Design a protein with these regions (language model features):
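Active-site-proximal alpha-helical scaffold in enzymes
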Residues: 132-145, 196-248, 287-308, 397-419, ...
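Phosphate/pyrophosphate-binding loops at sites that engage ATP/ADP/AMP, CoA/4′-phosphopantetheine
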Residues: 139-151, 303-310, 340-356, 378-382
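Glycine-/small-residue-rich "gating" segment that lines the acyl/pantetheine channel
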Residues: 177-187, 228, 232, 236, ...
Length: 470
């Protein structure tokens, strides 16, 4: 094995990362170097690589983007607002926020689901399902797909969410207490509509998608993992088209009370637009937000066959677990770094290929420093040369929807060579000393972009997208 290991050390960076990708499939995460792998695992990975040599996985491209967010009710409006550095955070209006220490949120404005969803059906849905379906319409129209002409058995849906329709259950309980009657008995389907898998179901029902139907429930990592999972379905050939993304609709009192008790949310109520301050020395917690992001993903062959506009290619993704604490990040940042390395291995590229990072960056004192450390661990001295920005500085933390909206920002970045800023970054923090694109958007060529999502429960996910090249 000594001679073999010496040969492996002379592999090109891309070939070495291909081997690391095989090792990721074997062990669940990629090691940082081939030298750290046992002889047995190395031989297994090599056999797998040789066996798969004639079976190239299908390429996955992004052809449609949809969004409903605190800064825009379409993906186009959302992107324009992000580039302009517009905050969507204001005092909460959906319930009486007065008793709570954190009184602002990233609410979707002027949202009327009945513009696209029959009014009776919309009334039954949880807010997360309403947001998801409207974002899916936006994505479908943006893609130019002729839905009715598709083989619906080869169209699937994967959505991520943290808590699904908690707002529906919150309202059912509150109204039952007020009225003294069991509201569930009179409206049985309303309770079912609060289940976490309902956003995916409603998208499937709306478009008649009869392929794989899945829901990822991994808190703040859910949207990113949903896009990665959907990409895998296309890669292995089980479908041609996937709707994929994430959603959350949790501007509700129980959610505010919970995070207030954890002391996790910002209490800078005097100026809500400046409350979300990722990487800033005066950051004091995240701001709760709501919204949805949905992608239309296609196999490259399917997209080219119908003459689709292609925004970007999904190059790879990775995931890991901290196995440390239910809410706090691992101080060593090993899990976050492992997710990034796994995504690089899956994409078969070296760290030097990444030219932009959309950070998880929620604005918590521990979390932002933790992510900065992880980025330095993966990229070394070059970390200081990579532009990094936080979408959450403008929309707040969308939980299950965050990863999808932030991945959308990455896609638009590689498509337009424009990087949106991190707003409210005014006071440098010595622990957060990288290039966070403060306050003003930037033009720069970006061939590959990386998006991080780190969820409660220590769930880490990273997605990499790149410019499409035939």
């Amino acid at each position: 094995m000594t001679e073999l290991r010496q040969l492996l050390q002379r592999l090109s960076p891309n070939l070495r990362y291909a081997l690391l990708g095989e090792l990721q499939g074997l062990n669940g995460q990629a090691p940082s170097e081939v030298a750290k792998v046992s002889d047995a695992d190395l031989l297994t990975a090599l056999r797998s690589a040789i066996g798969d040599a004639g079976r190239q996985r299908r390429r996955v491209v992004v052809t449609g983007l949809g969004a409903v967010t605190p800064v825009g009710n379409t993906a186009v409006d959302t992107w324009d607002a992000l580039v302009a550095g517009k905050s969507g955070i204001a005092r909460v209006t959906q319930f009486d926020i007065t008793p709570y220490a954190s009184q602002m949120g990233g609410e979707v404005k002027n949202f009327d689901p009945s513009n696209r969803i029959p009014r009776k059906e919309a009334r039954r849905m949880a807010r997360c399902s309403q947001l998801a379906v409207i974002a899916a319409y936006d994505a479908a129209e943006d893609s130019g797909l002729d839905i009715e002409s598709l083989d619906k058995t080869r169209v699937g849906v994967v959505m991520g969410t943290g808590l699904g329709g908690m707002d529906l259950y919150n309202n059912i309980i509150a109204e039952s207490v007020r009225s003294g009657e069991n509201r569930v008995k009179s409206r049985p389907l309303e309770a079912i509509n609060g289940l976490p898998n309902m956003p995916a179901f409603h998208i499937s029902q709306t478009f008649g998608a009869r392929g794989p139907l899945n829901t990822i429930v991994t808190a703040c990592a859910a949207g990113t993992q949903a896009i990665g999972t959907a990409s895998e379905e296309i890669r292995r050939g089980s479908v041609d088209v996937m709707f994929a993304g994430g959603v959350e609709g949790l501007i509700v009192d129980v959610f505010y009370a919970s995070f207030e008790a954890m002391r996790a949310v910002s209490t800078s109520n005097d100026d809500p637009a400046k409350a979300s301050r990722p990487f800033d020395a005066k950051r004091d917690g995240f701001v709760i937000g709501e919204g949805a992001g949905v992608f239309v993903l296609e196999s490259l062959e399917h997209a080219i066959g119908r003459g689709a506009r292609i925004y970007a290619e999904v190059l790879g993704w990775g995931q890991s677990a901290d196995a440390y604490h239910i809410a706090a990040p691992d101080p060593q940042a090993t899990g976050a770094a492992a997710a990034m390395r796994a995504a690089l291995a899956d994409a078969n590229i070296s760290p030097d290929a990444i030219e932009y990072i959309n950070a998880h960056a929620a604005g918590t004192p521990l979390g932002d420093a933790h992510e900065t450390k992880a980025i330095k661990d993966v990229f070394g001295p070059r970390a200081y040369q990579i532009p990094i920005s936080s979408t959450k500085s403008m929309v707040g933390h969308l939980f299950g929807g965050a990863g999808a909206v932030e991945a959308m920002a990455c896609v638009r970045t590689v498509y337009t060579d424009t990087i949106h800023p991190t707003i409210n970054l005014e006071y440098p923090d010595p622990e957060c000393d990288l290039d966070y694109v403060p306050n003003v958007a930037r033009k720069a060529e970006v061939n590959a972009a990386l998006s991080n999502s780190f969820g409660l429960g220590g769930q880490n996910a990273t997605l990499i997208v790149g410019k499409f090249r035939e």
